[in-house]
């Protein structure tokens, strides 16, 4: 199918979906391209970001955890956004696109529940029906967010097939959309999936990096040495990276979930430890068995528990413009505790992976003068029960 925008990033991306969905994807691409040129759409989107979501978000300097080192560490506070995470940014944009296309329903998938909450709040605000697919395991471990979604009128549908996690929720959401696309918009939650979703999500998240650049120049008078973000599908990271890609002196560091350790096979790090294949409508690195079946990913963080990654990240990795590392559950948990104890901020377990890598950089070279920015992509209220149970089992509380 001929597209208006390039569906690939290098060799990654594309539109590997059933023929029945091609008209829906084409309609979405046309609506997006039109909206990007429409001052009225942009004004409405920017008004919602400012007066409903609460942008711009703060850039907070860590006062205590860098003591005794030459590291200056800032946090981009997406946790302060309405809804509790960066997810709110792009769902407002997609919900406006849905209205522009005349859709009356929203279909979404969610892992940690943050995208589900964001989809529910945007649907409630704009008068759209909303149904959300969520792995049954994630429904159990993210019960506060499930209740929030239902409070805002969303129907939450537990998915019991497969590993009962995010990848299975994605499959069910796509299956639903195949039969309902004439009235429903599929509000994909990350910078992955078939074209044009990776491009749309990147554009509707790029204000994270744009704000960060302006704020750090105002605060420090220079650009950071590196910006750091966690990577599951990759939306918060591409939102942070997008405005810095051409700033070649700024390192881009994406942090994948190392789970119980890469050597155990129980992780979610396809960029560094997967193989390229076709999944979820795109060509990208993914966790596969020897015979090409999609492997189960694992992370303490439901929002990073995804066996593939967005095509922009695959491309940035292949060109060497961005570096991708992994952080284990234990390292993320220590970073979570550190930020709580020393800065009075409770981060999401997803964001704790990015923070853990920044702290590792700080500890390994304490004498090095470095200016780092971590994208604190969400708040940790949703994770307190998970952390409580782990710490209780360890006898730490």
From Swiss-Prot:
Pfam families: PALP. Keywords: Amino-acid biosynthesis, Aromatic amino acid biosynthesis, Lyase, Pyridoxal phosphate, Tryptophan biosynthesis. It catalyses: (1S,2R)-1-C-(indol-3-yl)glycerol 3-phosphate + L-serine = D-glyceraldehyde 3-phosphate + L-tryptophan + H2O. Pathway: Amino-acid biosynthesis; L-tryptophan biosynthesis; L-tryptophan from chorismate: step 5/5. GO terms for cellular component: cytoplasm. The keyword Acyltransferase does not apply. InterPro entries: Trp_synth_b_CS, Trp_synth_beta, Trp_synth_beta/beta-like, TrpB-like_PALP, TrpB-like_PALP_sf. Transmembrane segments: none annotated. This is Tryptophan synthase beta chain. The lineage of its organism: Bacteria, Pseudomonadati, Pseudomonadota, Gammaproteobacteria, Enterobacterales. The gene is trpB.
């Amino acid at each position: 199918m001929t597209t208006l925008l390039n569906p690939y990033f290098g060799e990654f991306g594309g539109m590997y979906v059933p023929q029945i969905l091609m008209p829906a994807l084409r309609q979405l691409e046309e609506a997006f391209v039109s909206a990007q040129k429409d001052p009225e759409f942009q004004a409405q989107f920017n008004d919602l970001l400012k007066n409903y979501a609460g942008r711009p978000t703060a850039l907070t300097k860590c006062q205590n955890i860098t003591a005794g080192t030459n590291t200056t560490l800032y946090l981009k506070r997406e946790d302060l956004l309405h809804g509790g995470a960066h997810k709110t940014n792009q769902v407002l944009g997609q919900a406006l696109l849905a209205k522009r296309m005349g859709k009356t329903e929203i279909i979404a998938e969610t892992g940690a529940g943050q995208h589900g909450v964001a989809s529910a709040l945007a649907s409630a605000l704009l008068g759209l029906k909303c149904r959300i697919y969520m792995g049954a395991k994630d429904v159990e471990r993210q019960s506060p967010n499930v209740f929030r979604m239902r409070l805002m009128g969303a129907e939450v549908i537990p998915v019991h097939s497969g590993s009962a996690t995010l990848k299975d929720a994605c499959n069910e959401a796509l299956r639903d959309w195949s039969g309902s696309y004439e009235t429903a918009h599929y509000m994909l939650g990350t910078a992955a999936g078939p074209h044009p979703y990776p491009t749309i999500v990147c554009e509707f998240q790029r204000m994270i990096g744009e704000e960060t650049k302006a704020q750090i120049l105002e605060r420090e008078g220079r650009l950071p040495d590196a910006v750091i973000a966690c990577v599951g599908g990759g939306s918060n990271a591409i939102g942070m990276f997008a405005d810095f890609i051409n700033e070649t002196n700024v390192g881009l560091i994406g942090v994948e979930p190392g789970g119980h350790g890469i050597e155990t096979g129980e992780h979610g790090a396809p960029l560094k430890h997967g193989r390229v294949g076709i999944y979820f409508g795109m060509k990208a690195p993914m966790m596969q068995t020897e015979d090409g079946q999609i492997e189960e990913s694992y992370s303490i963080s439901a929002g990073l528990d995804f066996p593939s990654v967005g095509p922009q990240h695959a491309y940035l990795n292949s060109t060497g413009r961005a570096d991708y590392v992994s952080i284990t559950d234990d390292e993320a948990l220590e970073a979570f505790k550190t930020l709580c104890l020393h800065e009075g901020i409770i981060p999401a377990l997803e964001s704790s992976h990015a923070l853990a890598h920044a702290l590792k950089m700080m500890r390994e070279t304490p004498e090095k003068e470095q200016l780092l920015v971590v994208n604190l992509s969400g708040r940790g209220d949703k994770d307190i029960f998970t952390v409580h149970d782990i710490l209780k089992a360890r006898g730490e509380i």
